Regions:
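Gly/Gly-Pro-rich "capping" loops immediately C-terminal to redox-active cysteine motifs
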Residues: 49-52, 66-96, 105-110, 159, ...
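C-terminal capping alpha-helices of c-type cytochrome domains
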Residues: 109-132, 141, 181, 209-230
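Residue-level hotspots at or immediately adjacent to binding/recognition sites across diverse folds
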Residues: 65, 164, 200-204, 214, ...
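The canonical Cys-X-X-Cys-His
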Residues: 57-65, 119, 155-165, 222
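Bacterial N-terminal signal peptides
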Residues: 21-34
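N-terminal alpha-helical segment
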Residues: 69-72, 100, 138, 154, ...
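N-terminal secretory signal peptides that target proteins for export/translocation
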Residues: 1-20
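Electrostatic cytochrome c docking/interface patches
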Residues: 37-56, 68-73, 125-152
Length: 230
């Protein structure tokens, strides 16, 4: 595997390489275009600000008053600063059972596309400090994996899709400041929660080989690194 220098990395180049290895690249492309179209349709409508604020307060009961996430027995993700397109896509994924979570299915299926777009925009505008709590001794190792990948395991750099600052772009989520235990839980259980509807191709397939190839200590290191970023 050839490692792309940091100053030459670009999302399209890396993702094209990953997608070319998938057995259904055309279906994946169709899904991406459909998702973008759904998001565009969502923005055409309007929702009264009072309703948006009421729904935001409902979301913050679990995700935190500043959407910073919740670090408990069941870690709940940080939504603050998240890419709007990604948030819209994930809510749609819950509705279509591409991603499994009974609580979020019940929340998402009651939302109109216009409300989803409004919520995503509001969460994107928030920027509270990270909650922290990750083992500091893992951060340096996590940074190296995130920025350079693991060539001996044929694992590309996380930064190639998520960006060198982990800010994400479009359908690729922002990982900056994401909760340490949440990142671990999602990567360890990736195949159990993502891509669950075979009739609807899902971009989660891009991450599947990466999540399955990382061992627990490597996952913990990457999670520690991104959780410290601001």
């Amino acid at each position: 595997m050839t490692i792309i220098p940091r100053n030459q990395r670009s999302e399209p180049r890396f993702c094209a390489t990953i997608r070319s290895a998938l057995v259904w690249p055309i279906a994946l492309a169709a899904f991406v275009f459909a998702t973008v179209g759904w998001a565009e349709d969502a923005r055409k409508g309007t929702v009264p600000e009072k309703e948006v604020q009421a729904k935001l307060q409902y979301c913050k009961v679990c995700h935190g008053v500043s959407a910073q996430g919740f670090r408990g027995y069941y870690p709940i993700p940080r939504l603050a600063g998240q890419q709007p397109t990604y948030l819209e896509n994930q809510l749609q994924a819950f509705i279509e059972h591409r991603r499994t979570n009974n609580v979020m299915f019940n929340v998402a299926h009651s939302l109109s596309p216009s409300m989803v777009a409004a919520l995503a925009a509001n969460f994107n505008a928030l920027n509270p400090p990270p909650l922290g709590g990750a083992p500091r001794q893992l951060v340096a190792t996590g940074e190296k994996i995130f920025q350079d990948g693991l060539p001996n395991q044929d694992i590309a750099a996380c930064a190639a899709c998520h960006g060198p600052d982990a800010a994400g772009a479009g359908l690729f989520p922002r990982l900056t400041g994401q909760l340490y235990p949440y990142v671990i839980d999602k990567l360890v259980n990736w195949g159990k929660e993502r891509g669950q509807n075979p009739k609807i191709p899902d971009t989660s397939a891009i991450m599947s080989p990466v999540a399955h190839s990382l061992n627990k200590s490597q996952i913990e290191a990457v999670a520690a690194y991104v959780s410290t970023l601001k």
